Amino acid sequence: MHAESFDTPLAARLADARHAPRAGEVVLYWLGQAGFVIDTPEARLLIDPYLSDSLAQKYRGTRFPHERMMPAPIAPHDFDRLDLVLCTHRHTDHMDPGTLQPLAERFTSLRFVVPEASLDEALRRTGASRERLIPVEAGQRVPLFDGCTVSPIASAHETLDTDEAGRHPWLGYVIELHGVRLYHSGDCVPYPQLHERVRQAAPDVALLPVNGRDATRSGNGVPGNFTLDEAVELARAAHIPALIAHHHGLFGFNTLAPEVIDARIDDEREHGALSIHRAQTGCAWHIGASTPRRARMGE
């Protein structure tokens, strides 16, 4: 993988054929929080896009007002094409009606991958018809289109939960695109089986939240995620060559300072084997399927 900086608006970048992914290549762009564009020559995917101010409107005047620290890098109506959206769970910064409904209206064939446990909520939040939703559950391997599958892994959003039918409301996704495997954990903390489940999936890159957790946030309805140390440990234990650290920089009460992440990047570059990247806008991460897995993620 190599990272490429750019200074054009993301919408213009995505619409410019000169920057289209090459055959066998996957290109990632960060949307803020846990959101990413996953671009390939065959299809364009989004995962956990939060591109509105839904939460600022909902929580205005409360202890945690959810005011943005950064603007959305693109508006829903500015995408020139889109084929699939994946939502890891029902929380609004991952399944946002202010983002999903405009996308569903603009792209009438757009489909949505959602946890089966939250299907009813997903129907309300997307505003899409039932046939446009693809409900998934941990342990499945679901074909999405030619050369692309998603394999959900249960996530623990502080707790490893199931509903009355035994279905997991919090999921991570292993997304395979023509030989490139991405693991996006959704919101997650460590639990005993996680490292082995992820290791067996053999991802090339992990997209992991690093905003951590504490009693103040969880006690006020804001369950947390991996610490940076825990995210690094998961990537190492699962033998993942590279990590993009995200879920920071959007809400002031629920973030990690960029200099803390950058210091860990520098330390790992000097003393370790893991390639760590801090999610940031104005950056494209290129992953090529033709390169051997261990070499693929080098700087």
Model regions: which residues?
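Active-site environment of divalent metal-dependent phosphoester hydrolases
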Residues: 54, 91-95, 119-121, 140-143, ...
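Pre-active-site segment of Zn-dependent metallo-hydrolases
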Residues: 14-19, 43-90, 98-102, 160, ...
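Active-site HxH/HxHxD metal-binding segment of metal-dependent hydrolases
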Residues: 54-60, 73-142
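Cap/insert and terminal regions of metallo-dependent hydrolase folds
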Residues: 111-113, 117, 189-281
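Divalent metal-coordination and catalytic microenvironments
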Residues: 38, 48, 89, 96, ...
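Metallo-beta-lactamase
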Residues: 2-23, 114-180, 264-298
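Catalytic core of the metallo-beta-lactamase
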Residues: 34-39, 143-204, 222, 226
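Zn-dependent metallo-beta-lactamase
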Residues: 1-67, 237, 272
